[in-house]
């Protein structure tokens, strides 16, 4: 189900940090 797929920011900063994008995206330091 689509709503079970984590958003990019959630995947970065939530369940799997750094998996989908740089960790700087979590702190707006990119």
From Swiss-Prot:
- Does this entry carry the keyword Cell membrane? no
A molecular function GO annotation: toxin activity
Compartmental location? Secreted
**Glycan attachment points:** 7
Q: Which cysteines are joined by disulfide bonds?
A: 12-21, 13-26, 24-30
Query: What are the record keywords, sorted?
Result: Disulfide bond, Glycoprotein, Hydroxylation, Ion channel impairing toxin, Neurotoxin, Presynaptic neurotoxin, Secreted, Toxin, Voltage-gated sodium channel impairing toxin
> Does this entry carry the keyword Disulfide bond?
yes
Give the GO cellular component terms, alphabetically. extracellular region; host cell presynaptic membrane
Any further remarks?
A: Found in both injectable (milked) (IV) and dissected venom (DV).
> Domain note for this entry?
The cysteine framework is IV (CC-C-C-C-C).
Q: Indicate what this protein is called per its UniProt record.
A: Conotoxin CcTx
Species this protein is from? Conus consors
